[in-house]
Swiss-Prot record:
Database matches in PANTHER family: RIBOSOMAL PROTEIN S9 (PTHR21569), SMALL RIBOSOMAL SUBUNIT PROTEIN US9M (PTHR21569:SF1)
Record family assignment: Belongs to the universal ribosomal protein uS9 family.
Entry's Gene Ontology molecular function annotations: RNA binding; structural constituent of ribosome
Species, as recorded: Pseudothermotoga lettingae (strain ATCC BAA-301 / DSM 14385 / NBRC 107922 / TMO)
Keywords, in A-Z order: Ribonucleoprotein, Ribosomal protein
A Pfam family this chain is assigned to: Ribosomal_S9
GO CC annotations on file: cytoplasm; small ribosomal subunit
Gene Ontology terms describing biological process: translation
Highest rank taxon of the organism: Bacteria
Protein name per the record: Small ribosomal subunit protein uS9
Length: 134
C-alpha cells in the first residue's frame, strides 16, 4: 500500500465529521477500522448507503477504489452526509476532472443546517408551552 498514492478528504454534516482516504484497488470498504462488504451493513439502510457513496457512482469509480472511512459524531444520516462530502473532496484531489461532474450533482457544498438551540421559556427550540386564553 505504500507504493500507491493515497488521497484524503474531510467532510462535515450536522455534528458528524468524516475523514476519507482512497487508494486505487478493487472496491474494499473499511469504516472505523472494520471491513464491510457493503455500506448498507454500516448505515443499516440502502438509501443512506447510496447517498454516502454516490460520488463513486457518479464518477464511475465504484469498485475501482479502496475506501477507508473514519467517521464520528451525530447519527447515521449526518454521518452519511459527512462521508459523501469527504469522498467527493478526496476524488477531486485524485483527479480534478471530476470537479464539474460532482459540482453539478451538488456534492461539493457543505450543508450548513444545524440543530437550532433550545430557548429558555420554551419547550424546544420553537415549541411554546400551551396557551390558555382564560
Amino acid at each position: 500500500m505504500m507504493d500507491k498514492a493515497i488521497f484524503n478528504g474531510l467532510g462535515r454534516r450536522k455534528t458528524s465529521v468524516a475523514r476519507v482516504y482512497i487508494v486505487s484497488g478493487n472496491g474494499k470498504l473499511t469504516i472505523n477500522d472494520k471491513i464491510f462488504a457493503s455500506a448498507e451493513e454500516y448505515f443499516k439502510d440502502r438509501v443512506r448507503a447510496r447517498h454516502a457513496f454516490e460520488p463513486l457512482v457518479v464518477t464511475n469509480n465504484d469498485g475501482k477504489l479502496d475506501v477507508f472511512v473514519r467517521v464520528e459524531g451525530g447519527g447515521l444520516s449526518g454521518q452519511a452526509g459527512a462521508v459523501r462530502l469527504a469522498l467527493a473532496r478526496a476524488l477531486i484531489k485524485m483527479d480534478t476532472s471530476f470537479k464539474p461532474v460532482l459540482k453539478s450533482h451538488g456534492m461539493l457544498s457543505r450543508d450548513p443546517r444545524m440543530v437550532e438551540r433550545k430557548k429558555y421559556g420554551l419547550r424546544k427550540a420553537r415549541r411554546a408551552p400551551q396557551y390558555s386564553k382564560r
